[in-house]
């Protein structure tokens, strides 16, 4: 273990957890995790450009939250090893995996290279993080394909 997590790190994680419990944030997370299954960059851009829809607000809220959390790690305010524990940042990997295959196109079409940049840096920043991202990407891709197929009739 390079740097041992401190009580300050633990308090920061608990504050991040409290932010995730806020009522509107729960709705936003629920939408992103369960209902939002983009099949391509245009599906993401449709929501990103549907200002001021509820889905647009939720996408910005979830993305902004995880970008903020990742920036704390990138700037040394939060211990990376602690942050990478599945119960703390597992959701971050999942939301990144949903847009990861389309990120280059999304960034180009929005003319914004910073979209998901901090999240991506943390997810690619260590061997442990890269292994998790690889695993989550695979799982999300299987789920995405299942979501795209019409339900079979019995």
Role assignments for model-derived ranges:
Residues 1-154:
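Acidic, Ser/Pro/Thr-rich low-complexity regulatory regions
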């Amino acid at each position: 273990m390079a740097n041992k997590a401190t009580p300050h790190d633990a308090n920061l994680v608990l504050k991040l957890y409290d932010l995730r419990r806020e009522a509107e944030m729960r709705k936003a997370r629920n939408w992103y995790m369960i209902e939002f299954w983009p099949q391509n960059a245009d599906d993401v851009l449709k929501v990103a450009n549907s200002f001021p829809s509820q889905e647009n607000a939720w996408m910005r809220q979830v993305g902004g939250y995880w970008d903020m959390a990742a920036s704390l790690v990138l700037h040394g305010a939060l211990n990376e090893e602690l942050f990478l524990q599945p119960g703390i940042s597992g959701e971050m990997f999942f939301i990144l995996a949903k847009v990861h295959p389309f990120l280059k196109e999304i960034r180009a079409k929005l003319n914004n290279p910073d979209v998901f940049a901090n999240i991506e840096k943390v997810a690619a920043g260590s061997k442990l993080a890269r292994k998790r991202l690889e695993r989550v990407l695979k799982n999300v891709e299987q789920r995405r394909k299942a979501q795209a197929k019409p339900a079979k009739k019995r």
